[in-house]
Design a protein with these regions (language model features):
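N-terminal helical cap/lid subdomain that shapes the substrate entry/recognition surface
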Residues: 1-58, 62-63, 75-79
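Asp-based, Mg2+/Mn2+-dependent phosphohydrolase catalytic module
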Residues: 30-35, 54-61, 65-148
């Protein structure tokens, strides 16, 4: 068996399909519902940056800081982020499906650190999930800022 937070593009699609099947109680339409949701969240229109995201990213970039996106999403994140300001300003984009681990796995955080060339204490994670972002980021030794 795979470790609980190990992932890949295939595993992420299967995990999301299982969530849809559970929510819709294995209805005959589950496959169609999953396909619609998969398509929907692969489109730019489905995403809305936080209202203060632009000012936060601009402040970081103006100070010469590296800004990266690190998400429990799949490789579609690259195309989506490239088309949405301020996400398109990010220096690097990390999708869990490409890293091979999803948050809260320590391996996710270590891989991002290695690819950024940073020590844990040099990283500020801005996130909205109390467990996957805030608690896991702190456990990894990162600075964290919770947003809603």
């Amino acid at each position: 068996a795979s470790p609980p937070f190990a992932t890949s593009s295939r595993r992420e699609a299967a995990r999301r399909r299982a969530i849809v099947a559970e929510v819709f109680d294995q209805q005959p339409e589950t496959d169609a519902i999953f396909a619609d949701l998969w398509d929907h969240f692969g489109r730019v229109e489905a995403w809305r940056p936080l209202p203060f995201g632009s000012s936060l990213m601009r402040a970081a970039l103006d100070r010469g800081l590296t800004v990266a996106l690190a998400s429990n999403f799949d490789e579609r994140l690259h195309a989506i982020a490239g088309l949405i300001e301020p996400l398109s300003w990010a220096d690097q984009v990390f999708a869990s499906s490409e890293i091979g681990w999803r948050k809260p796995a320590a391996e996710f955080f270590r891989t991002v650190e290695q690819r950024l060339g940073c020590e844990p204490a040099e990283i500020l994670l801005v996130g909205d999930d109390p467990d996957l972002d805030i608690a896991a980021g702190r456990l990894a030794g990162w600075h964290v800022l919770g947003v809603a």
